[in-house]
């Protein structure tokens, strides 16, 4: 299953809720302000780092660049472009958006 998170983890608890409910092996794609959850050295970075042992974590590269955090993305987070987003949606049987 593909889970998308579009809210900043510093504004809403969407990322926490996603991590608590996603099943092991799921893909988590951080988009829009959700990409702040992929940055290192923050209050949520340890939680996301731990989650990467159970999930594959992606961030939408255009959103990362737009927000000026490309140099702060954690090791292990895979950056994808819009075509990669489409591929993830096609590869997974279901998509859950966490708002």
Where are the regions that the model predicts?
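Short, basic, glycine/proline-bearing loop/turn elements
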Residues: 1-4, 28-35, 69-71
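Short internal beta-strands
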Residues: 27-32, 55-63
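Charged helix-capping and loop-helix junction motifs
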Residues: 41-47, 79
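Short, conserved loop/helix-junction motifs that constitute active-site signature segments
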Residues: 20-24, 48-53
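C-terminal structural segments of small proteins and small subunits
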Residues: 67-99
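Histidine-anchored nucleotide/phosphate-binding helix
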Residues: 10-23, 28
């Amino acid at each position: 299953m593909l889970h998308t998170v579009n809210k900043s983890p510093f504004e809403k608890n969407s990322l926490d809720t996603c991590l608590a409910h996603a099943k092991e092996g799921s893909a988590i794609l951080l988009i829009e302000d959700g990409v702040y959850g992929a940055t290192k050295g923050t209050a949520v970075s340890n939680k996301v780092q731990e989650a990467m042992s159970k999930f594959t974590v992606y961030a939408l590269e255009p959103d990362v660049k737009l927000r000026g955090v490309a140099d702060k993305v954690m090791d292990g987070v895979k950056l994808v472009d819009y075509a990669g987003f489409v591929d993830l949606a096609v590869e997974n049987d279901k998509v859950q958006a966490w708002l």
